[in-house]
Swiss-Prot record:
Consists of three domains: the N-terminal catalytic domain, the editing domain and the C-terminal anticodon-binding domain. This is Proline--tRNA ligase. CDD domains: ProRS-INS (cd04334), ProRS_anticodon_short (cd00861), ProRS_core_prok (cd00779). It comes from Lactobacillus helveticus (strain DPC 4571). Belongs to the class-II aminoacyl-tRNA synthetase family. ProS type 1 subfamily. Keywords: Aminoacyl-tRNA synthetase, ATP-binding, Cytoplasm, Ligase, Nucleotide-binding, Protein biosynthesis. Homodimer. GO terms for biological process: prolyl-tRNA aminoacylation. InterPro entries: aa-tRNA-synt_IIb, aa-tRNA-synth_II, aa-tRNA-synth_II/BPL/LPL, Anticodon-bd, Anticodon-bd_dom_sf, Pro-tRNA-ligase_IIa, Pro-tRNA-synth_IIa_bac-type, Pro-tRNA-Synthase_IIa_type1. Its main location: cytoplasm. One of its GO terms (cellular component) is cytosol. It comes from the Bacteria. GO terms for molecular function: aminoacyl-tRNA deacylase activity; ATP binding; catalytic activity, acting on a protein; proline-tRNA ligase activity; transferase activity. Its EC number is 6.1.1.15.
């Protein structure tokens, strides 16, 4: 490809509103251009990278015998209403009506559509296990699109779905997909951690995220140094090392605590450590009033809490509801005589405490020396706390390390979450009707590209991993009016183009402009044809090299083959 004919509008400076380094690079390098908030056009350079990534996915899916197909962007609302996700998905769904008033949506994902097709066309256990996938543009009405391709309103995604007759088949499919995903990310040059994750609105109970460490990441993952434990902070577990020595129960005493509306203020006022205080927080789970208890030095993890309560809607009671239900304002709520609560659950940190401080059920009052069983009851003890960095992990008891990261993939064991609701049944070996068992698998392809840039930035540009680089070799000719340079550059272009994608900079530009653009292209190998062309000498440079190295054209083949394989 001749660069003089290649549309690559580069910029010296990134737009002022670009925050993520990947966003800045892709704008400056002429990879993408914004059309509207959260929506981008992929220019030739960006589209080449996108197609390379899609090619890796197609290759790896072929290896595990998963065929590709394509679904429509425009989906009927009725399918999502049937699954119950039409309302649950929330404001991020693009909804519209046609001229006849029929409701539709732009697909953010396609579980319902695949399930409907399977329900109509898969009837016997003999047709399973089966898996399908597509690479397609998705839509999400982000409230605040930002960070370029990392959080857009339109994005490219691989979404795949598996269908099984037994749990064993699902487990095998899940493992195959997980292995394929690891290979995809490795080939794309993106370092990832497979981590325990929350399924969110997707349904199902078991899921694994693929998180790419990056400074701009919006997620936090907790790992140990051996790599034997990794989880999204939303689901991370840790070992609580605090132990209170047993004490004899003291007399329950009510004390005034004016203005102590935080744990810090209360601990200071009563001159007790936060570990001596039990926080009581009222949550509304559908129509149930649930009082949640946790030790004062810990924080409630609402994702874990949501799993425990297993309700369609869970939220902390606001001040008006709190006053109406408990008779107290925030800080005074407590578990003693809390007959108004439908259920009281407590974090495991509350289990072995003695003579603690709890809300007295009255604004600005607390009970001292409250004891479990004597003064209040708990219906269930569960892990609902947020893990803290440095706490021991639950596997090898090593300190947890927190890292910001980008979610680039997510795989789920959906089970029968959709198929039961949507009537996707099959006949088993005994002729009995059973719901198909599903898995769901996704890679944010455009997110993966942003993650690759974030992980492979150089001082002046990017060092693309070789399998997704827009060009493998970038030939830069210094002076276009020198016949010896032109002759050698064209010879190298013809030779290497037989095996690799080659960009030949044949523009009549200054050397500084050419090198600056080459840094933004980020090809694994840059070959500079300059003043020693007549002697059969060129310069080679990798994006991570500090400076170029002279090499004879006789040795160039060996160098290229070593670098590109």
């Amino acid at each position: 490809m001749r660069q003089s004919k290649f549309f690559m509008p580069t910029l010296k400076e990134a737009p002022s509103d670009a925050v993520a380094e990947s966003h800045k690079l892709m704008i400056r390098g002429g990879y993408i251009r914004q059309v509207t908030a959260g929506v981008y056009a992929y220019l030739p350079l960006g589209y080449r990278v996108l197609r390379k990534a899609e090619g890796i996915i197609e290759d790896e899916m072929e290896k595990i015998n998963v065929p590709e197909m394509i679904m429509p962007h425009l989906l009927p609302a009725t399918l999502w209403q049937e699954s119950g996700r039409y309302k649950k998905y929330g404001a991020e769904m693009f909804k519209l009506k046609d001229r006849h008033g029929r409701e539709s949506l732009l697909g953010p994902t396609h579980e319902e559509t695949f399930t409907e097709i399977i329900a109509k066309n898969l009837k016997s256990y003999k047709q399973m296990p089966l898996a399908l996938y597509q690479i397609q543009t998705k839509f999400r009405d982000e409230n605040r699109p930002r960070f370029g391709l990392l959080r857009g309103r339109e994005f490219v995604m691989l979404d795949g779905y598996s269908f099984a007759a037994t749990r064993d088949q699902l487990d095998e499919q899940f493992d195959d997909q997980k292995s394929a995903y690891k290979r995809i990310f490795k080939r794309a040059g993106v370092t990832v951690h497979p981590v325990i994750a929350d399924s969110g609105t997707m349904g199902g109970k078991n899921s694994t995220e693929f998180q790419a460490p990056a400074a701009i990441g919006e997620d936090t993952i907790a790992t140990n140094e051996k790599g034997t434990y990794a989880a999204n902070l939303e689901m991370a577990k840790s070992i609580d090392t605090f132990k209170q020595e047993p004490e004899d129960a003291k007399e329950l005493t009510k004390v005034a605590t004016p203005g102590c509306d935080t744990i810090e203020k209360l601990a200071k006022f009563l001159n007790v450590p936060a570990t001596r205080i039990v926080k009581s927080i009222l949550y509304i789970a559908d129509d149930q009033k649930v009082l949640v208890l946790i030790r004062g030095d810990k924080q409630i993890n609402e994702v874990k809490l949501g799993h425990v309560l297993d309700a369609d809607e869970v939220h902390e009671a606001d001040s008006a509801d709190l006053k109406e239900i408990t008779g107290s304002e925030k800080g005074g709520v407590g578990p003693v005589d809390a007959d108004w609560a439908d259920k009281i659950i407590a974090d495991e940190t509350v289990k072995d405490l003695y003579n603690v401080v709890v809300g007295a059920g009255e604004t600005d009052y607390q009970f001292e020396n409250a004891n479990l069983d004597r003064d209040f009851k708990v219906d269930e003890f569960v892990d609902i706390r947020t893990a803290n960095e440095g706490e021991p992990d639950p596997v090898d008891h090593l300190p947890l390390k927190f890292t910001t990261s980008i979610e680039v993939g997510h795989i789920f064991k959906l089970g029968t979450y959709y198929t039961k609701t949507m009537g996707a049944d099959f006949l088993d070996q005994n002729g009995k009707a059973k719901p198909v068992i599903m898995g769901s698998y996704g890679i944010g392809v455009t997110r993966m590209l942003s993650a690759a840039v974030e992980q492979h930035l150089t001082e002046h540009g990017v060092a693309w991993p070789k399998e997704i680089a827009p060009f493998a070799i970038h030939i830069v000719q210094m002076k276009m009016n020198k016949e010896d340079q032109t002759e050698l550059a064209e010879k190298l272009e013809k030779k290497f183009s037989e095996k690799y994608d080659v960009l030949y900079d044949d523009r009549k530009e200054r050397a500084g402009v050419k090198f600056a653009d080459a840094d933004l292209v980020g090809a694994p190998i840059r070959i500079t044809v300059g003043k020693k062309a007549a002697d059969g000498i060129v310069e080679v440079k990798r994006p991570t090299d500090d400076k170029a190295t002279e090499i004879s054209i006789d040795e160039l083949d060996k160098f290229v083959n070593q670098e590109l394989g």
